[in-house]
Design a protein with these regions (language model features):
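Bacterial N-terminal signal peptides that target proteins for export
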Residues: 1-10
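A general structural-boundary detector
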Residues: 11, 40, 89, 157, ...
């Protein structure tokens, strides 16, 4: 098993707050179209690449530090911080792996026995000297007296992972289910161009029975809090699995709107970033479709299926003088 970490990046956490002040009182502020004025200030610095930032019921910011492998709580009033958890089994080598998504259970600090925090991280599943990168979700219990997270329980593990397009956002939905975004693992792209994209792949019943999650790439998953497949998940092509929607490239933003609709923000191939309304059983088209499917300069080329060995392919990049 190998474990690596990148040097910390010195990043600033900046929050924007509305304030009824004049431009003279807020020389660095920004006025929104509705007349609201936003001001910014540094709340915390020198964090290890903050990835998830969410408001907790304790009026603190809860933050995952992707390359420091920590969950840190920050008081926005004075910037004081408290480390709730440091993980020692995260594998991280690139800009899209490490300790990523975090979801606070709605019952956190409500004395209902569900002081739960869900964390998404990559790890090395190889027991030897090699590396087999995988992704898992664990549930931790928060101890308000000690202000720490403990008692980890694995919700799901052995999910495919790579060094790019990991997705990794997690939410607890209004229905009490977990929603987890999964990217296409950077396949068919840059250094990973010889890896096949699995965003359109769907599991067989045998794969689900064997807990083989190879097709869980380029998807939004929906899980029970214990990792089980919800009974009301969509049946897609005859199989019910954790898959809620598919055909996605790299959905890193995931949120529920005020009416209960689920939205995802998705990175496109250097163009066609999307805001998607995520619906049960829907196919969002990737890699055959990018954006509105109106970009005639985009065509899917599956390098892994080339008759010439993929690793020996050579690429020439040109910029046309005029576009159709």
């Amino acid at each position: 098993m190998a474990q690596r970490g990148q040097p910390w990046a010195v990043l600033l956490l900046v929050v924007a707050a509305t304030a009824a002040v004049s431009s003279g009182q807020n020389p660095r502020g920004t006025t929104a179209p509705g007349g609201e004025t936003f001001a910014s200030r540094v709340v915390a610095a020198n964090l290890g690449n903050p990835w998830e930032v969410t408001w907790g019921p304790d009026a603190h910011l809860w933050i995952t530090e992707r390359t420091a492998f920590r969950v840190t709580r920050v008081d926005p009033a004075d910037g004081s911080r408290k480390v709730a958890l440091t993980l020692d089994d995260v594998y991280q080598t690139s800009v899209q792996d490490g300790l990523m998504g975090m979801a606070l259970h709605p019952d956190l600090l409500k004395s209902r026995g569900r002081d739960w925090v869900f964390l998404v991280s990559t790890y090395d599943a190889d027991a030897g000297s090699g590396v087999t990168r995988r992704l898992r979700v664990r549930r931790y219990t928060y101890d308000p007296a000690a202000q720490t997270l403990g008692s980890p329980v694995t919700v799901i593990d052995d999910l495919p992972a790579h060094d790019d397009h990991g997705g990794g956002r997690i939410l607890v939905g209004p229905d009490g289910k977990l929603y987890l975004s999964r990217g296409d693992q950077g396949s068919n792209w840059l250094a990973n161009y010889c890896n096949a994209i699995h965003s359109q792949d769907l599991p067989t019943a045998a794969e689900i029975a064997a807990r083989d999650w190879v097709s869980y790439q380029g998807k939004v998953l929906r899980l029970e809090v214990d990792g089980a497949i919800p009974a009301d998940n969509p049946t897609i092509k005859g199989v019910r699995s954790h898959i809620f929607s598919y055909g996605l490239r790299n959905p890193q933003g995931l949120t529920f709107g005020p009416s209960g609709l689920l939205y995802a923000s998705e990175h496109g191939p250097s163009t066609d970033d999307e805001i998607d309304l995520i619906q049960a059983g829907k196919n969002y088209g990737w890699p055959h479709v990018a954006g509105y499917n109106d970009d005639r300069s985009y065509a899917y080329a599956n390098w892994s299926a080339s008759s010439t060995p993929c690793a020996s392919l050579e690429f020439t990049y040109t910029t046309p003088q005029a576009r159709p």
